[in-house]
Amino acid sequence: MNKYRRGLALGALALAVFILIGVGISMRATPQPVNLTQVLTDIRDGRVTEIHLANDGQAAEVTYTDESKTRVALPAGESLTTLLTDAGIPVERWPDIYPAGNGAISADLMLLLRILTIVAVGVVIFVLFRRFGPSSIGTTPTRRGSFEPIRPGERVITFDDVAGAEEVKEEVADIVDYLRDPERFRRLGARIPRGVLLTGPPGTGKTLLTRALAGEARASFFSVSGSEFVELYVGVGASRVRELFRKAKENAPAIIFIDEIDAIGRRRGRMEQSSEYDQTLNQILVEMDGFEERTTVVVVAATNRVDILDPALLRPGRFDRKVVVDLPDRKARRAILEVHARGKPLAENVNLDELAARTTGMTGADLANVINEAAILAARDRRETITNQDLLEALDRTLAGPARNARRFSERERRVVAYHEAGHAVVAHLLPHADPVRKVSIVSRGRAGGYTMIVPDEDRGLWTRAQLSDRLAALLGGLAAEELIFGDITTGSSNDLEQTTAIATSMVQRYGMGKRFGLLSTGAGSDLQQLSPQSAYTAEQEALELVQQAHQVALDVLRAHADDLERVAQRLLEVETIDGEELETLISPPRQLPVRRPVEQALPTPLHRAPIREGRRKGSAHRVGRAIGLVASFTRDAVESLRAAKPQIDRT
């Protein structure tokens, strides 16, 4: 970058100098013309010192006593001396007169100087283009020559630094063996995949895993982003691809990592896509096809939008191995926390198992941030060790934001928040299929006035209709509490309504849990464009019915346990934060509730209809088998769309 800026500055300086010289010469060579009568008057008054004739006596350059100059045209066929005599100017007042060619710059010379100036400007621009590429004018410089690898031995990361991804490491272990000892595979005629596509949510460690792969294989590591290839000028991206692969072959064995490959690997033929994207993608395909049998270069790409990639990228011989880097389970989260806690002084009361249980649905990047935030909190308080309280506070800050102690509610608003969060907690604690409540707080964090942390006992990939229905009721527990206690609702339920709308819509349009809409799926999200108006109306009405039924369930639970609601709310007003164990002591055993679920009356009666749970459910009787291969896509969709492990944040 410094070299680029220096060259651009020198070019701009040279251009400015040439322009100034050209302007100066032009101004000097072409004095401002004046009227002949005015010149004769100035000569009579003695203000003219010399006159230079030009153009065969048809023009004259007049120099004044103050050294200023003007240009005057002379009448054809008349000499300057005749004009002076006819004007009655005494000879002693005549200035020095020089014939043509003795001092004035000719028009031809002036034209030549202008042409030379234009040529010089063109040369400067040409040199800039040749030196720095076409993108050095008006955009950023090309990256040609800037693809520098991380060589073996530099900042080594190995599989020991990647925790919680044992299955993924097994998938890429043969690539490590191939890069270390390619002859063993060649003797057997084995062909190692040239491309590996890592897919999964952001923050799951795809980049870290690739660096560890290079470290284990002792290979050079090239890391680029898909957006780095594309520029305004057509052909720049393709040239960068060629340069990248050329350098990788020179530094073999090597691994090329292309992050966010969907930036250049989108399906071709779209109207809004420019030819620059197509040329860049074509060049990547050509380079991967051009690998020789003895080339020890492997391309690893990462994306979380595999559905939009061009099919040519995914065919055998290119990115023919696809590895899913999914969210870590509880055991993996425990291992990830241990890795990030290395070298940090932890207090004896730190319980990483408890923290792993509370962080369901978090990625490796989220967990690293929790550990780092806890270290910052300990340093801020000038303590020598990181305590368990630091970790729990860091978790709250990561999920809900820092506590806003300066934000003070009025006493009425504080009561509204307390009853709102108590409503969530009571409903979630009593319903048989809702997840357990870990924490309830009315401490303002971020934009939330309070929050209820509802985290499952175990990692879940599948959701039943009963679980989703109770989830809806728990989400609407805060709004129901406001209605019962204050007779009105507030804007604090906006986040709850967003979540209930998304879940109810998915239940009807994606998971076949509706009564009238049937076993149909409209795809991701709530897209109703592909449906007829009647079907879209039916889907909307059925989703609305699910929400209304869940709302009624929440009201019934809170009416039957009004004393529990009051106890929890008053305790929140006293201490502001309640954990799950204390919450269990505040809520009495469940009573027989008039729970109405009209949507289930039209369905077959479940054989294992569970009663309202006694106390806090441990979850062992509700575990769902995970060895169901035919529902893998449903499992991923459920995890991505519901994210039930995230705490419920209520903006009150």
UniProtKB/Swiss-Prot annotation:
For the Extracellular compartment, the record's topological domain ranges are 28-108
Q: Which GO terms describe its molecular function?
A: ATP binding; ATP hydrolysis activity; ATP-dependent peptidase activity; metalloendopeptidase activity; zinc ion binding
Localization recorded for this chain is: Cell membrane
Residues annotated to bind Zn(2+): 420, 424, 496
Concerning InterPro entries, the annotation shows: AAA+_ATPase (IPR003593), AAA_lid_3 (IPR041569), ATPase_AAA_core (IPR003959), ATPase_AAA_CS (IPR003960), FtsH (IPR005936), P-loop_NTPase (IPR027417), Peptidase_M41 (IPR000642), Peptidase_M41-like (IPR037219)
List the Cytoplasmic topological domains. Answer: 1-6, 130-652
Required co-factor(s) are: Zn(2+)
**Ligand binding (ATP):** 200-207
- In short, the EC number is 3.4.24.-
A single Gene Ontology biological process assigned to it is:
proteolysis
Task: State the NCBIfam families in the record.
Answer: FtsH_fam (TIGR01241)
Active site as annotated: 421
Q: Which HAMAP family match?
A: FtsH (MF_01458)
Extract the Pfam families matched here. Answer: AAA, AAA_lid_3, Peptidase_M41
Record protein name field: ATP-dependent zinc metalloprotease FtsH 2
Similarity section = In the central section; belongs to the AAA ATPase family.
Q: How is the protein disposed in the membrane? A: Multi-pass membrane protein
CDD domains (UniProt xref): RecA-like_FtsH
Species of provenance: Sphaerobacter thermophilus (strain ATCC 49802 / DSM 20745 / KCCM 41009 / NCIMB 13125 / S 6022)
Q: Which GO terms describe its cellular component?
A: plasma membrane
- Free-text function comment from the UniProt entry: Acts as a processive, ATP-dependent zinc metallopeptidase for both cytoplasmic and membrane proteins. Plays a role in the quality control of integral membrane proteins.
Does the keyword section mention Repeat?
no
**Which UniProt keywords are listed?**
ATP-binding, Cell membrane, Hydrolase, Membrane, Metal-binding, Metalloprotease, Nucleotide-binding, Protease, Transmembrane, Transmembrane helix, Zinc
Its quaternary organisation is:
Homohexamer.
The transmembrane segments are 7-27, 109-129
Subcellular location, principal:
membrane
Q: Has UniProt tagged this entry with the keyword Protease?
A: yes
